[in-house]
Each structure stands twice: as structure tokens, then as C-alpha cells.
Design a protein with these regions (language model features):
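TPR alpha-solenoid repeat register
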Residues: 81, 122, 160-162
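Residue-level recognition of tetratricopeptide repeat
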Residues: 78, 119, 157-159
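Structural signature of tandem alpha-helical TPR/SEL1-like repeats
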Residues: 56-66, 95-111, 135-148
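Short coil/turn linking the two alpha-helices of tandem helical-hairpin repeats
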Residues: 37, 42-53, 86, 91-97, ...
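Terminal, low-structured helical/coil segments at or just beyond the last alpha-helical repeat
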Residues: 24-28, 140-178
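Canonical positions in the second alpha-helix
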Residues: 71, 111-112, 151-152
Length: 178
């Protein structure tokens, strides 16, 4: 019986080990895609300060964005891919479709928050993006941006603390008090 039971248990356990190795490899590839996307964007932002052509910017921006999209397709239940894409489209998309992409950025940050309701970085960036968008004073975007920054600030997210300290006058004028 022992001779039969041990190989049977080993066969049952083997797929778990194989799946764990596959998942680990998938996770490493996922993180690599996100990192590559951010690296392309960092390089692009530095060169944008030196004013490259719009076509060149969009070509390289698309490559960075594709890295985030590939990461989301690979592991759609992970928050990092949505933060990556939200950051890309929300803050760095240029041209006439910028406002539409900012709204997509808000949706991606919201998706990351739905995956992890305590993801302070997503709250922070959704708040910053909301405040940076053209909006009406007192709009729903305005109110949500204030709530998001407050959540990150009250939970000691360093960037939110710095933002609040630097923009107290703006926040007060926008009825976003701390």
C-alpha cells in the first residue's frame, strides 16, 4: 500500500509545484514588463524636456504603454499593472485625446483600488490626476480627488504629505481642508 500511496501523492503534489514555478516565472515577467514601461517613460520624459517631435514621443509612449497592457493581460488581478497604465495615460498622454485618456487613467487607478482598497499610491495618483484635470469647482471629480488625497495623507503616504504641505493654499481654495 505504501508503494502505491507515495507515488500517488507525489503525482498529486507535482502539478502544484509546477504551477508555483510557472506562476513565479509569470510574476517575474509581469514585474519586468512594468519596470520596462516605467524605464521607457522616464527616458521619454527626460527627452520631452528637450522637446522631441510629437510623432517620436507618441511612438515611444505607445511602446511604454504596451508594456503596461501586456502586464495587465498577463496578470489582470494584480494592482500594479493598472497603476502603471493609469499613470501612463493619465499623466503623459498628449494631443487632442488627452482628456479622454485622463478619464481612462482615473478608471485604471480606480481598478487598482478595487483590487486593493488600501493601495495608497493609487489613491494619491487618482487624487493628483483629478486635481490636474479641467473640471468644475465642486464636481464629483473634484470631491473624489480631495477624498483620495486625504486618505493617502491620513495614512502617512509620504508623497501625499509632501503634496498637501506644498499646496495648502490651493487645497483650501478648493474646499479641501485637512
Amino acid at each position: 500500500m505504501k508503494r502505491f500511496l507515495i507515488p500517488l501523492l507525489a503525482t498529486i503534489a507535482l502539478p502544484t509545484v509546477v504551477n508555483a514555478n510557472e506562476n513565479n516565472g509569470k510574476l517575474l515577467e509581469y514585474k519586468k514588463l512594468i519596470e520596462e514601461g516605467y524605464e521607457i517613460l522616464d527616458d521619454l520624459v527626460l527627452r520631452d524636456e528637450k522637446n522631441p517631435t510629437y510623432e517620436q514621443y507618441m511612438e515611444e509612449f505607445s511602446l511604454a504603454l504596451e508594456k503596461c497592457n501586456e502586464a495587465i493581460a498577463m496578470i489582470p488581478e494584480d494592482k500594479e499593472g493598472y497603476l502603471c497604465r493609469g499613470f501612463m495615460v493619465g499623466f503623459h498622454k498628449k494631443g487632442p485625446s488627452r482628456i479622454r485618456y485622463q478619464k481612462k487613467g482615473l478608471k485604471d487607478f480606480t481598478k487598482a483600488i478595487k483590487i486593493d482598497p488600501e493601495y495608497l499610491e493609487a489613491y494619491y495618483f487618482r487624487g493628483i490626476l483629478g486635481f490636474s484635470m479641467e473640471r468644475r469647482h465642486g464636481s464629483s471629480i473634484d470631491a473624489r480627488a480631495c477624498r483620495d488625497i486625504k486618505k493617502a495623507y491620513k495614512n502617512n503616504f509620504p508623497e501625499a504629505i509632501e503634496y498637501v504641505n506644498q499646496h495648502k493654499t490651493f487645497l483650501k481654495e478648493d474646499n479641501c481642508s485637512f
